[in-house]
UniProtKB/Swiss-Prot annotation:
This protein's record includes keyword Transcription: yes
Compositional bias annotation for Basic and acidic residues: 1048-1060
Protein name per Swiss-Prot or TrEMBL: Avirulence protein AvrBs3
Practical uses of the protein: By varying the BSR in each core repeat, DNA-binding domains can be generated that target specific DNA sequences and thus act as transcription factors. By combining the central DNA-binding domain with the catalytic domain of the restriction endonuclease FokI, TALE-nuclease (TALEN) enzymes able to target specific dsDNA sequences can be created that enable eukaryotic genome modification. Other potential uses as transcriptional repressors, for transposon targeting, DNA methylation or histone tail modifictions are also possible.
Domain remark text: The N-terminus is responsible for protein export from the bacteria. The central DNA-binding region is composed of 17.5 tandem core repeats with 1 base-specifying residue (BSR residue 13, also called repeat variable diresidue, RVD, residues 12 and 13) which recognizes 1 base in the target DNA; 10.5 or more repeats are required for strong gene expression (tested using an artificial TALE, PubMed:19933107). The BSR is the only residue which contacts DNA in a sequence-specific manner. The number and order of core repeats determines its specificity for different resistance alleles in plants.
GO biological process: symbiont-mediated perturbation of host programmed cell death; symbiont-mediated perturbation of host transcription
Residue window of motif Nuclear localization signal NLS1: 1021-1024
Broad class of where this protein is predominantly found: secreted
Length: 1164
């Protein structure tokens, strides 16, 4: 029988003074071992002795000799190694081949979690202690194991679910049980404790020292503490923060709690200690790093080594290689930053001189996890990929500039021929798939699943590429294969909706969450499937859906929001955070800052809504009091992606731009009120003098170019291409400005430079026509489509080049042209329309949607409701044709009492006059209309038919103009066609909101713009209030109709596909009156739409398009977005200011006869 050993603790097991390695943390209930020979000698060890440490090795080695380390590894149970290390790495990060010293220190701390003492301590202890015999079996049985009482603790008795208990390793459950009561008392939930159990040592540290942590880090949340503690050196990192937080909060860094926790979570204990030790050197000369830069570098695996390397190499890289400190920081601020910096120092000259890359491209490649390996692979494969596979250096750089760039480049080299030859993909599509984190895996999955998804599930190769071209594309493709049948058959989604959900970062999780929550959100919360799809179709869709399920009742019942507004907030990247911030800040912003709930929703309904709301709370008083902005202007700036940065930049640059550059605050606001407003403002500050002095532009033209999404890039491209386009291609500066003054101006200018000679020489277009096509959002895509389809449409479909140009010269020109190619035969042969009528419908913003709606509703309107095809065409040919036709169908199918008295002819005339806004305005009740009707009846008691034009004739005249193939001749031809004098025709047009100049040139404004003029001329629309005026709720409701007026594309029904053009048309409608002079107006045959003063940006402009992932181009404006599916857009736009402020300023008031004509059209 084995002898009973003494329980006197060995010196190696005694707690040492000072900080303990993770796994040997002291606890409050740790007692002192009884002396040898005591009454408890020989009994099994007390469980309290092992609660915060893992089991001891069966037998210590005599000394740390040559073979002792291998013995230690044999004794080490691999299951004890904390896998949270790998969870904390990027999902497709680079695989580093070098192990830094500090990283090895942390690996050793993981080994110490097995209760093995440090090697130096073992040398000292075992030298004075002879080797022990093999432990007795009974002693081994006393150790905690899967079969021991410690491992069999049932945590369900403490309220943990079975699933939560299974997530906790058996050997850790006793530690969880020991500290459960203390942690729960500190406010930690069961889920928090389960997460913290990933690193058992942190359980005791947090339980014992939570009060000290809150004292040192008062803003720390439970989630933040758990986020640090569950890391592989989390307990030590928290201990380090307790020691150094006070000094790091003071000069020179003055870090806040969030920054301190970020360093501790991502960089570990070594990073915290390094920041503390080197804080003065990092922020002083010659490095002069900002606190934000120090945090960025330190907040990664290997942060300590990166900080050390920055101190050594930053001066060298800046002085000898021409990099900026910002570029050096960008390279260092990733996992493996040390190795990346050293590789940039070594390879930058080679890549630039021998391979033709720019320093910026080298920095882009290096500024990712695994930058070292990516740079080396670019050096090796760039010649091969370009010469043998036909890629451009830019495409190679795009592939390499992601985590895992090395593997992606190697996979492109291997699979590009296969994917192109066997699967029909283009090199551009292969590059798009590869240019993301995890590009290697995505390419391999496309190779495996493309045939299956296309043949068995009916997807197109383009849809498969869209799904794969995101982070996590591999998983998304596999999930689409698994869930597409279920989501379509059981939940009623379309394949297109499934693709939309999957084509984002986290598409796999979003699809699974839609499967789980779609029935709940629809049945319990009243959402439509389209709204659920809209929420899910963004990065982080899973989290957004779960948050909508949780917060929708609260936001609606406690805060008065509508479900549509909640959907609008959630339907963006970061929707979860935006919803939570609205819940928290809505009362504050409304009560303390005077904003309306609608304005708060508008700010939140963008990517980065959370940060924008927090910045509005902070800067609204400053911008209004110190800089003279109005709350409306602050909201306009904030209501874009990147609103936070735009607001901060306005605060910084408004005085400079106004005082040094002569801009007005209104112009600064106009520039800032777009996605990328920060960058646009900075570029205006930098390039305004150059563009004005060297290129002859006016400040107003510079502002016009900058006042769009992508304003920075557009300004830089104008600086570069203006001389070329004017000297080599014969354009005027005004034409260049017109092209650049739209979303995607950069791409449009570059495409004009490339295609102008081709379109003019090979296709017979004039430079003016090319400029007209390019001068819209999506001009690049429209020009490329004209080049491709002009021969087809003219030869196969009988259109003229002028008609093709007319279709292309609108927002969404590309989808309109493609739809004409597809539907022209159908509409002419099956529905009896003429090619001229099809062209008239297509030649407006949203032409694609209007054509599809005519195809769908023409039989219904004609057969079931008695309208003529000419009437349908007249409604569809006025801009905003789709919503106008849908409103007519809805009224004829389910009459609204406000419109019930109108005949079909009256309804058609009203729809032609003002589209859906006119019909909606009458339904809601026109302000002042009853008094106006009475006044008119009193003053003109006898209204005879000769005093007013026949309403049917108005429809015929409008339809004639819209379908005329030569607009400039339409006026003269109309006089002949209808037997009208010049004065009579002008009088008719004036009654429908058209000026003499517009009528004579044949370029009629959209219906909603004409309706706006009619309302103002008739006195039924209030003048624009001053920015400082306020409205009572009664006033606001009285004039609600005016706030709902839309331009060409009105808010679609949530049951229909959204108009991508909606955002672009509103953007384009901003008047250059505040930012451009008359010189910006072009004399093209195709009208350049009026633009609106950016000061009064309607909140509905905040709906943004998804970004493209490759090629640098903007999304095609005709592409439907998930956001358009949300009914929230309609409600949002009901709060908008009139989108055509100033459009009717010069339109004179109606006289009494004109009022009488109008009143005869309206319900009495």
């Amino acid at each position: 029988m084995d002898p009973i050993r003494s329980r006197t603790p060995s010196p190696a097991r005694e707690l040492l003074p000072g900080p303990q390695p993770d796994g040997v943390q002291p606890t409050a209930d740790r007692g002192v071992s009884p002396p040898a020979g005591g009454p408890l000698d020989g009994l099994p060890a007390r469980r309290t002795m092992s609660r915060t440490r893992l089991p001891s090795p069966p037998a210590p080695s005599p000394a740390f000799s040559a073979g002792s380390f291998s013995d230690l590894l044999r004794q080490f149970d691999p299951s004890l190694f904390n896998t949270s290390l790998f969870d904390s790495l990027p999902p497709f990060g680079a695989h580093h081949t070098e192990a830094a010293t500090g990283e090895w220190d942390e690996v050793q701390s993981g080994l110490r979690a097995a209760d093995a003492p440090p090697p130096t301590m073992r040398v000292a202890v075992t030298a004075a202690r002879p080797p022990r015999a093999k432990p007795a079996p009974r002693r081994r049985a006393a150790q905690p194991s899967d079969a021991s009482p410690a491992a069999q603790v049932d945590l369900r008795t403490l309220g943990y679910s079975q699933q939560q208990q299974e997530k906790i390793k058996p050997k850790v459950r006793s530690t969880v049980a020991q500290h459960h009561e203390a942690l729960v008392g500190h406010g930690f939930t069961h889920a928090h404790i389960v997460a913290l159990s990933q690193h058992p040592a942190a359980l005791g540290t947090v339980a014992v020292k939570y009060q000290d942590m809150i004292a040192a880090l008062p803003e720390a949340t439970h989630e933040a503490i758990v986020g640090v503690g569950k890391q592989w050196s989390g307990a030590r990192a928290l201990e380090a923060l307790l020691t150094v937080a006070g000094e790091l909060r003071g000069p020179p860094l003055q870090l806040d709690t969030g920054q301190l926790l970020k360093i501790a979570k991502r960089g570990g204990v070594t990073a915290v200690e390094a920041v503390h030790a080197w804080r003065n050197a990092l922020t002083g000369a010659p490095l002069n790093l900002t606190p934000e830069q120090v945090v960025a570098i330190a907040s990664h695996d290997g942060g300590k080594q990166a900080l050390e390397t920055v101190q050594r190499l930053l001066p060298v890289l800046c002085q000898a290689h021409g990099l900026t400190p910002q570029q050096v920081v960008a390279i260092a601020s990733n996992g493996g930053g040390k190795q990346a910096l050293e590789t940039v120092q070594r390879l930058l000259p080679v890549l630039c001189q021998a391979h033709g890359l720019t320093p910026q491209q080298v920095v882009a490649i290096a500024s990712n996890s695994g930058g070292k390996q990516a740079l080396e692979t670019v050096q090796r494969l760039l010649p091969v990929l370009c010469q043998a596979h036909g890629l451009t250096p830019e495409q190679v750089v795009a592939i390499a500039s992601n985590g895992g760039g090395k593997q992606a480049l190697e996979t492109v080299q291997r699979l590009l021929p296969v994917l192109c030859q066997a699967h029909g993909l283009t090199p551009e599509q292969v590059v798009a798939i590869a240019s993301n984190i995890g590009g290697k895996q995505a390419l391999e999955t496309v190779q495996a699943l493309l045939p299956v998804l296309c043949q068995a599930h009916g997807l197109t190769p383009e849809q498969v590429v869209a799904i794969a071209s995101n982070i996590g594309g591999k998983q998304a493709l596999e999930t689409v294969q698994a869930l597409l049948p279920v989501l379509c058959q059981a939940h009623g989604l379309t394949p297109e909706q499934v693709v939309a959900i999957a084509s984002n970062i986290g598409g796999k999780q979003a699809l699974e969450t839609v499967q789980a929550l779609l029935p709940v959100l629809c049945q319990a919360h009243g959402l439509t499937p389209e709204q659920v799809v809209a929420i899910a179709s963004h990065d982080g869709g899973k989290q957004a859906l779960e948050t909508v399920q949780r917060l929708l009742p609260v936001l609606c019942q406690a805060h008065g929001l509508t479900p549509e507004q909640v959907v609008a907030i959630a339907s963006h990247d970061g929707g979860k955070q935006a919803l939570e911030t609205v819940q928290r800040l809505l009362p504050v912003l409304c009560q303390a800052h005077g904003l309306t709930p609608q304005q708060v929703v508008a700010i939140a309904s963008n990517g980065g809504g959370k940060q924008a709301l927090e910045t509005v709370q902070r800067l609204l008083p400053v911008l209004c009091q110190a800089h003279g902005l109005t709350p409306e202007q602050v909201v306009a700036i904030a209501s874009n992606s990147g609103g936070k940065q735009a607001l901060e930049t306005v605060q910084a640059l408004l005085p400079v731009l106004c005082q040094a550059h002569g801009l007005t605050p209104e112009q600064v606001v106009a520039i800032a009120s777009n996605s990328g407003g920060k960058q646009a403002l900075e570029t205006v500050q930098r390039l305004l003098p150059v563009l004005c002095q060297a290129h002859g532009l006016t400040p107003e033209q510079v502002v016009a170019i900058a006042s769009h999404d992508g304003g920075k890039q557009a300004l830089e491209t104008v600086q570069r291409l203006l001389p070329v386009l004017c000297q080599a291609h014969g354009l005027t500066p005004e034409q260049v400005v017109a092209i650049a003054s739209h979303d995607g101006g950069k791409q449009a200018l570059e495409t004009v430079q490339r295609l102008l000679p081709v379109l003019c020489q090979a296709h017979g277009l004039t430079p003016e026509q090319v400029v007209a096509i390019a001068s819209h959002d999506g001009g690049k895509q429209a020009l490329e489509t004209v080049q491709r389809l002009l021969p087809v449409l003219c030869q196969a479909h009988g259109l003229t080049p002028q008609q093709v140009v007319a279709i292309a010269s609108n927002g969404g020109g590309r989808p309109a042209l493609e739809t004409v190619q597809r539907l022209l035969p159908v509409l002419c042969q099956a529905h009896g329309l003429t090619p001229e009528q099809v062209v008239a419908i297509a030649s407006h913003d949203g032409g694609k949607q209007a054509l599809e709606t005519v195809q769908r509703l023409l039989p219904v309107l004609c057969q079931a409701h008695g309208l003529t095809p000419q009437q349908v065409v007249a409604i569809a040919s006025n801009g905003g044709g789709r919503p106008a036709l849908e409103s007519i169908v809805a009224q004829l199918s389910r009459p609204d009492p406000a419109l019930a008295a109108l005949t079909n002819d009256h309804l058609v005339a009203l729809a032609c006059l003002g589209g859906r806004p006119a019909l909606d305005a009458v339904k809601k009740g026109l302000p002042h209309a009853p008094a106006l009707i009475k006044r008119t009846n009193r003053r003109i008691p006898e209204r005879t038919s000769h005093r007013v034009a026949d309403h049917a004739q108005v429809v015929r005249v409008l339809g004639f103009f819209q379908c005329h193939s030569h607009p400039a001749q339409a006026f003269d031809d109309a006089m002949t066609q209808f037997g009208m004098s010049r004065h009579g025709l002008l009088q008719l047009f004036r009654r429908v909101g058209v000026t003499e100049l517009e009528a004579r040139s044949g370029t009629l404004p959209p219906a909603s713009q004409r309706w706006d003029r009619i309302l103002q001329a008739s006195g039924m629309k209030r003048a624009k209030p001053s920015p400082t005026s306020t409205q009572t709720p009664d006033q606001a409701s009285l004039h609600a109709f005016a706030d709902s007026l839309e331009r060409d594309l009105d808010a679609p029904s949530p049951m229909h596909e959204g108009d991508q053009t909606r955002a672009s048309s509103r953007k384009r409608s901003r008047s250059d009156r505040a930012v451009t002079g008359p010189s910006a107006q072009q004399s093209f045959e195709v009208r350049v739409p009026e633009q609106r003063d950016a000061l009064h940006l309607p909140l509905s402009w905040r709906v943004k398009r998804p970004r493209t992932s490759i090629g640098g181009g903007l999304p095609d404006p005709g592409t439907p977005t998930a956001a358009d599916l949300a009914a929230s857009s309609t409600v949002m736009r009901e709060q908008d200011e009139d989108p055509f402020a100033g459009a009717a300023d010069d339109f004179p008031a109606f006289n009494e006869e004109e009022l009488a004509w109008l009143m005869e059209l309206l319900p009495q």
